[in-house]
């Protein structure tokens, strides 16, 4: 297997940085959309393991994330239209994979925040992928999101979109961690594996406060997700842990699974791992989870084995 850097220039002048893990005889592609306040390189071990099993993996960093992101832009998508920009970035990554490796089925895995980016992508570009895998996602809780939007908009009105609010961080990540008191670190909610938690805590590209603007974009993006508008023949697979605070300890993930199924999607699956916290891919039983992801990547839908020549939406200026 070989590894190559990925560098793509977007129409609005942004540079997408990532990495490709290319086995000698790939049978499928997996594009990974990472979560908030982390980066694509955290999936390197998974990517290498999947590569050893003939899955071509592409990881990349969202805007405002990753080691190449300037400090002044960390945790911030864009001053305008941030959500659509990150969705279009993902579309560009997928199209690059399609063009470089024609004929291979493309699976999209989105984790946490990245799972919602992936859902927005599927809503707009669903015919471009063969399967959607959602890791550590949650239901679209509209009343809660609308209340959060009021608070975030108030802070933005006073402090500006680029302000990094510790209050929002405490109300989200801090709340998640309180479920695991007494806490050893501020990130115990991520995994039962203390080594994985310590690696996250020590990583300067992880755990930072995001801008109020990113939170505005994120909330608006989540509110725009409507599974009833997705392509019905797109397979959707949800995986989470029963102790994932983001997924409401399994409750929210189950509800989202039910919503997607009732929306008419023909193939929807849910896998809950007992006792697992937010990052199932970094959990104590991660090899079991990796094997499950490998199994999903090897499932090919003949109706989606080739990319369809659909026009892509124009990227925002």
Language-model regions, residue ranges each:
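N-terminal cap/lid segment of alpha/beta-hydrolase-fold proteins
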Residues: 1-22
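Active-site glycine-rich loops that stabilize anionic/oxyanionic intermediates
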Residues: 27, 34-38, 112, 242-243
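Conserved alpha/beta-hydrolase
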Residues: 45-73
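Alpha/beta-hydrolase active-site loop
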Residues: 78-98
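Alpha/beta-hydrolase fold nucleophile elbow
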Residues: 101-112
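Alpha/beta-hydrolase-fold enzymes
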Residues: 118-205
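Short beta-strand/loop motif that positions the catalytic acidic residue
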Residues: 238-240
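Catalytic active-site module of serine/aspartate enzymes centered on a nucleophile-bearing elbow/loop
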Residues: 263-317
């Amino acid at each position: 297997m070989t590894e190559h850097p990925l560098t793509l220039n977007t129409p609005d002048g942004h540079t997408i940085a990532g990495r490709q893990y290319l086995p000698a005889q790939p049978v499928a592609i997996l594009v990974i959309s990472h979560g908030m306040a982390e980066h694509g390189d955290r999936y390197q071990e998974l990517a290498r393991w999947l590569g050893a099993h003939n899955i071509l993996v592409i990881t990349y960093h969202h805007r405002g994330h990753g080691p190449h992101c300037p400090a002044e832009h960390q945790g911030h998508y864009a001053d305008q239209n941030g959500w659509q920009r990150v969705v279009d970035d993902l579309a560009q990554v997928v199209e690059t994979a399609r063009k470089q490796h024609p004929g291979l089925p493309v699976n999209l895995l989105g984790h946490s925040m990245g799972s919602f980016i992936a859902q927005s992508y599927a809503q707009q570009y669903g015919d471009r992928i063969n399967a959607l895998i959602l890791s550590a996602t949650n239901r679209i809780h509209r009343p809660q999101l609308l209340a959060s939007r009021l608070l975030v908009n108030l802070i933005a009105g006073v402090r500006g979109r680029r302000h990094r609010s510790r209050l929002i961080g405490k109300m989200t990540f801090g709340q998640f961690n309180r479920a695991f008191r007494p806490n050893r670190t501020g990130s115990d909610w991520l995994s039962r594996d203390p080594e994985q938690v310590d690696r996250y805590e020590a990583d300067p590209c992880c755990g930072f406060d995001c801008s109020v603007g990113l939170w505005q974009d994120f909330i608006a993006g989540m509110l725009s997700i409507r599974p009833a508008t997705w392509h019905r023949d797109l397979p959707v697979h949800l995986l989470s842990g029963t102790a994932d605070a983001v997924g409401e300890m399994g409750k929210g993930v189950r509800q989202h699974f039910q919503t997607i199924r009732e929306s008419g999607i023909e193939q929807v699956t849910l896998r809950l791992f007992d006792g697992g916290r937010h990052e199932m891919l970094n959990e104590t039983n991660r090899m079991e989870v990796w094997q499950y992801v490998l199994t999903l990547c090897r499932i090919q839908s003949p109706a989606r084995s080739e990319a369809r020549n659909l026009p892509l939406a124009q990227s925002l200026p």
